[in-house]
Amino acid sequence: KQTILLSGFDGLAELYMESLPQGTPLHFAVRANEPIPPDVAYSAASTIKIPIMVSVFNHLGEPTPDLALGWMRGMITQSENPPADALMRTYLDENLGPLMVTEDMRALGYQNTFLAGYFYTGAPLLQRIQTPANSRTDVYLDPDFYNQTVPSEIGDLLARIYRCVAAQDAQNTDLFPGSVTPNECQTMLNLLAENKIGALI
């Protein structure tokens, strides 16, 4: 935070960092060199594919079908959109798959993370979703109506996946206990580790 403030950065920066497995999160936001309340609504873009992956595992049993794993690999490691749509249509709901992802995120306590439509060109907006983050009046970044998140929620979701791997069984996780297993969480971590797209922040 001090580095950002000393640099005189006049834009908006928000950071969420957690020391795993059970560290205290560091979370702050700065705009025009002044601290502001965090959890600004952002367009989720391809980060929403992490909730899609989690949601699909929540609704699938083991062993995970090879078809699903192949689509997940394309979605996560190459950031491709068609596999994301295929996963939701096939394993969630043909028409309302994105809203099922949103429901699963709500079940985890995330009020600002949602997916309101498929990725394909011309996909309809299934629901106009209002959240605490996109209802703020002090800062508004014109986030995408189709998918949004905030750093603390996507960061916490990643932390849950990490902790799930270390759990002794599926009942001891804080990521859909009894539904998402440590083996499935390890698969998710492996896929995320394969994402080596050379894009600068």
Where do the model's predicted regions map?
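Active-site SXXK
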Residues: 40-63, 75
